[in-house]
Curated annotation (Swiss-Prot):
Subcellular localization: Cellular thylakoid membrane
Membrane topology summary: Single-pass membrane protein
One Pfam family from the record: PsbN
Keyword Chloroplast among UniProt keywords: no
Protein name: Protein PsbN
Gene Ontology biological process terms in this record: photosynthesis
Keyword match Electron transport: no
InterPro entries: PSII_PsbN
HAMAP family for the chain: PSII_PsbN (MF_00293)
Length: 43
């Protein structure tokens, strides 16, 4: 394979992995540990 194709596939796979981890953190089980700054702040 061409080195450019390998690089594009590697960068694409890393981007998909980071996006998947972000979605998992935002909406999966770890989201229970996230705090809402608007609820924590009292006027």
């Amino acid at each position: 394979m061409e080195p450019a194709i390998v690089l594009i596939i590697s960068v694409g796979a890393a981007l998909v992995a980071v996006t998947g981890y972000g979605i998992y953190t935002a909406f999966g089980p770890p989201s229970r540990e996230l705090s809402d700054p608007f609820e924590d702040h009292e006027d």
